[in-house]
């Protein structure tokens, strides 16, 4: 479709009307360029897909929404805007689209959040109820849904009242009532525990109400994980050919795709035996009480028992072999170099893939049959079986995918990382097997790039080391296929608005010198706090361990520090805003996640402290396998993996400072390697152009470190 004169006029008119809605609107050349580039791509005038880096201040959200809505209307398609996190998704849904509705009154839009963000009305009713009959019913359905105390029951009753009177839409993030994680776990549900159309509350369920709204909406705000799942199952979203897709925070897409394709499952022998026994009993109950018209051969008891016995013996053999690779009787991990399994293990995985897929198919067949049963049956008993079969289906789906992936030598032209872990839980050792592909470009090509005609990939940061090459390698986007890559200029004058400070540290932030380095950092930070020059500050760390050691050095300043983990992030930010508004000093302290999506302007943030260059962890099975693979191709892992990742992280961290034309301040980076190592100049060259200062550092006094046993974490 060509961009007609009428379409161009419509986009221009909306853009002009928008300027009147936003106080102190500043017209920006990069924004006009982005609107034009997005329009040309979505209309099919230029290229296949567009990757466009739009630095902070460009106004990228409105720059893709205006042309996106205009072209979607012209072509009678649905515009899907996908983000990487709930916060940005909610901002677009609750702020940006309502703003556009003022100039496009008939605009229809909705948001599609993951199932786990919505309340389950069945669970809410049970937790809000004071009637024992409700609890008895749910106990029969195998659900543990009882309020812990009267206060919790009253809270749930208030939530139910808000839901019933349409004061609340059922989203966790859209209520002021405090809901802790334990309560929300019981209030929400997952695919395996949802009765779907068989549920009494189906028509009023917030999750399914939203899913129905998608069919009528012109704009759907989703997230990357949901989009990937929808493209895989061809559900939730309209047909790919009838979509215009914008992937905001597009730099997260390869990681989200990899996470979606990562498979892990418990394979502990007693646990597996129990699951198989439960499934055979479940099938027997279905055959006895809700016998299907056509009996699948595998449901015949003798055949099913033999099938499960073979599966059990294979799992037992797998346990025996894997345990040989790990020290006995303790937590351990073993990774297979280059993802290559010994022939004996490979044969077991291939057979497991076939056997678990057959059980998955059987569970799906019974579930479909149970879902079609009429009201002439015992509805409570039927619902209990549906829930149990749904959970069995979920288990066998994961197992089938896991063993299929384990059987592959490569995925997207790269090895599949494969490893086993032994973990202790409640005094018992459990064995797990994990698989994840290093590259996901083939999957993205199949699900997105080849399926949807035109896609916009955008973010404030898409490049690392001034290059799109890392994005291209990880995503599979390429100029040869007609994809375009555009980097817009920043509208800010960084040279005048701020500066980079690299203190003259005595120590590099290596593991050997970590304690001395953090002591120096704490001394310089204390000096900055005592200067009282800055109200709002942010301190970013590459690891939780380093953050905790830093806090040990500044215990006397703890009251002004708002530390990640103390409270939910949005509450920390709210408190930070209130403090600064009252003229108090406030310091946010966090990890890399605080370097993204944190929009604090002016005095709210005028000094950013960065602990060190954030290279990716080198102990992750995925990173190690990728390094082995790159070396086998005579490529240098530091250049391909570590440095681009570090550059990307540093750009995001530094980007917290200048968020508007009125912002000012300093970025303090406690890492002299930026000036002493050859790669340091390349990292600095990829940052906005700031003047650089190198002040002296007061001597840090090293504290004695208390010996503490660090908790074991699962590595990926």
From Swiss-Prot:
GO BP, one annotated term: SOS response
Boundaries of every Helicase ATP-binding domain copy: 17-294
Catalytically driven reaction(s): Couples ATP hydrolysis with the unwinding of duplex DNA at the replication fork by translocating in the 5'-3' direction. This creates two antiparallel DNA single strands (ssDNA). The leading ssDNA polymer is the template for DNA polymerase III holoenzyme which synthesizes a continuous strand; ATP + H2O = ADP + phosphate + H(+)
Residues spanned by motif DEAH box: 131-134, 248-251
Keyword annotations of the record: 4Fe-4S, ATP-binding, DNA-binding, Helicase, Hydrolase, Iron, Iron-sulfur, Isomerase, Metal-binding, Nucleotide-binding
Cofactor: binding comment: Binds 1 [4Fe-4S] cluster.
GO molecular function: 4 iron, 4 sulfur cluster binding; 5'-3' DNA helicase activity; ATP binding; ATP hydrolysis activity; DNA binding; DNA/RNA helicase activity; metal ion binding
Positions bound to ATP: 54-61
Annotated ranges, domain Helicase C-terminal: 487-698
UniProt EC number: 5.6.2.3
Domain of life, per lineage: Bacteria
Residues engaged in binding [4Fe-4S] cluster: 120, 194, 199, 205
Necessary cofactors: [4Fe-4S] cluster
Family: Belongs to the helicase family. DinG subfamily. Type 1 sub-subfamily.
Functional note: DNA-dependent ATPase and 5'-3' DNA helicase. Unwinds D-loops, R-loops, forked DNA and G-quadruplex DNA.
Protein name as it appears in the record: ATP-dependent DNA helicase DinG
Protein's gene: dinG
């Amino acid at each position: 479709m060509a961009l007609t004169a009428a379409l161009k006029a419509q986009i221009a008119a909306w853009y002009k009307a928008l300027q009147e809605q936003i106080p102190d609107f500043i017209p920006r050349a990069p924004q006009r360029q982005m609107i034009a580039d997005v329009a040309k791509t979505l209309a099919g005038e230029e290229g296949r897909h567009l990757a466009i880096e739009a630095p902070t201040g460009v106004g990228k959200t409105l720059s893709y929404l205006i042309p996106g809505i205009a072209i979607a209307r012209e072509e009678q398609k649905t515009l899907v805007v996908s983000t990487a996190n709930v916060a940005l998704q909610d901002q677009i849904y609750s702020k940006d689209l309502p703003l556009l509705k003022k100039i496009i009154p008939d605009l229809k839009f909705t948001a599609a959040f993951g199932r786990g963000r919505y309340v389950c009305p069945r669970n809410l009713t049970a937790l809000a109820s004071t009637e024992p009959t409700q609890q008895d019913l749910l106990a029969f359905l195998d659900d543990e849904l009882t309020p812990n105390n009267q206060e919790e029951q009253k809270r749930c009753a208030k939530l139910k009242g808000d839901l019933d009177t349409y004061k609340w839409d059922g989203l966790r993030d859209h209520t002021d009532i405090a809901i802790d994680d334990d309560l929300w776990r019981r209030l929400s549900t997952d695919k395996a525990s949802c009765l779907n159309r068989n549920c009494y509350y189906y028509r009023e369920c917030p999750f399914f109400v939203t899913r129905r709204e998608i069919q009528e909406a012109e704009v759907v705000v989703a997230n990357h994980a949901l989009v990937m799942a929808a493209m895989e199952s061809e559900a939730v979203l309209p047909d790919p050919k009838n979509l215009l897709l914008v992937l905001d925070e597009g730099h997260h897409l390869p990681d989200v795709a990899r996470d979606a394709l990562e498979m892990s499952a418990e394979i502990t022998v007693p646990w597996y035996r129990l699951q198989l026994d439960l499934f055979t009993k479940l099938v027997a109950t279905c055959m006895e009480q809700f016998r299907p018209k056509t009996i699948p051969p595998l449901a015949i008891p003798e055949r099913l028992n033999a099938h499960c016995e073979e599966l059990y013996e294979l799992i037992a053999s797998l346990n025996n072999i894997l345990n040989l690779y790990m020290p006995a009787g303790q937590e351990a991990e073993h990774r297979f170099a280059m993802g290559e399994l010994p022939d004996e293990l490979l044969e077991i995985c291939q057979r497991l893939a076939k056997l678990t897929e057959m059980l998955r198919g059987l569970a799906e067949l019974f579930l479909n049959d149970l879902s079609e049963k009429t009201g002439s049956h015992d509805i409570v008993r039927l619902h209990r079986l549906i829930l149990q079969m749904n959970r069995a289906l979920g288990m066998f789906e994961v197992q089938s995918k896991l063993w299929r992936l384990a059987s592959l030598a490569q995925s997207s032209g790269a090895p599949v990382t494969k490893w086993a872990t032994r973990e202790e839980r409640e005094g018992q050792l459990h064995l797990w097997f994990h698989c994840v592909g290093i590259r996901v470009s083939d999957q993205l090509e199949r699900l997105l790039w080849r399926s949807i005609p035109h896609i916009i990939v955008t973010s404030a940061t898409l490049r690392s080391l001034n290059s799109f090459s890392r994005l291209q390698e990880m995503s599979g986007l390429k100029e040869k296929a007609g994809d375009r890559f555009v980097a817009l200029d920043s509208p800010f004058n960084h040279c005048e608005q701020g500066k980079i400070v690299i203190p003259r540290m005595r120590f590099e932030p290596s593991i050997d010198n970590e304690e001395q380095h953090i002591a120096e950092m704490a001394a310089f930070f204390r000096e900055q706090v005592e200067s009282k020059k800055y109200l709002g500050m942010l301190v970013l760390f590459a690891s939780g361990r380093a953050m905790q050691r830093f806090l040990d050095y500044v215990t006397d300043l703890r009251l002004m520090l708002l530390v990640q983990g103390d409270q939910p992030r949005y509450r920390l930010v709210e408190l930070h805003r209130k403090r600064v508004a009252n003229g108090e000093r406030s310091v946010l302290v966090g990890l890399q996640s605080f370097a993204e999506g944190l929009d604090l302007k002016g005095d709210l943030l005028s000094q950013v402290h960065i602990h060190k260059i954030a290279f990716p962890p080198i102990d992750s099975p995925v990173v190690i396998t990728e390094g082995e693979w790159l070396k086998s191709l005579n490529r240098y892992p530091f250049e391909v993996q570590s440095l681009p990742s570090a550059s990307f992280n540093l750009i995001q961290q530094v980007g917290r400072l200048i968020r508007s034309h009125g912002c000012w301040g300093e970025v303090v980076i406690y890492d002299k390697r930026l000036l002493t190592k050859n790669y340091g100049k390349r990292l600095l060259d990829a940052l906005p152009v700031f003047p650089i200062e190198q002040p002296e550092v007061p001597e840090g006094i090293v504290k004695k470190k208390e010996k503490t046993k660090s908790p074991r974490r699962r590595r990926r």
